UniProtKB/Swiss-Prot annotation:
Coiled coil: none
UniProt protein name: Protein MGF 110-6L
Stated role: Plays a role in virus cell tropism, and may be required for efficient virus replication in macrophages.
Reported induction: Expressed in the early phase of the viral replicative cycle.
Family label: Belongs to the asfivirus MGF 110 family.
Major localization class: host cell
Location of the motif Prevents secretion from ER: 115-118
Record keywords, A-Z: Early protein, Host endoplasmic reticulum, Signal
Amino acid sequence: MLVTFLGILGLLASQVSSQLVGQLRPTEDPPEEELEYWCAYMESCQFCWDCQDGNCINKIDGSVIYKNEYVRPCSVSRSMDKCMYDLNKGIYHSMSCSDPKAWNPYKYFRKEWKKDEL
């Protein structure tokens, strides 16, 4: 009985640790351990990319794009179970942190970098 209880407790603890917890004040530089979460649902945020010499490398999946209007400054915040993106210029997105939805109004600006193009 004790082994079963400890097993269930361990399972619950592992699930809780994978979810975002606590509050996050508005920031353009979210914690490193949360980048995968934030960038999965709004990948054009500037903090998701390392941009140099006109090209940008995605910090999560390593994809490369040309730097253009796709990469935008944005801030993120979390309060209770609400995760919010602020893309400035009056563009906001709010979602449940535990039931997130991808959202990207700039997806049409994305231009993949191709090795042969120079």
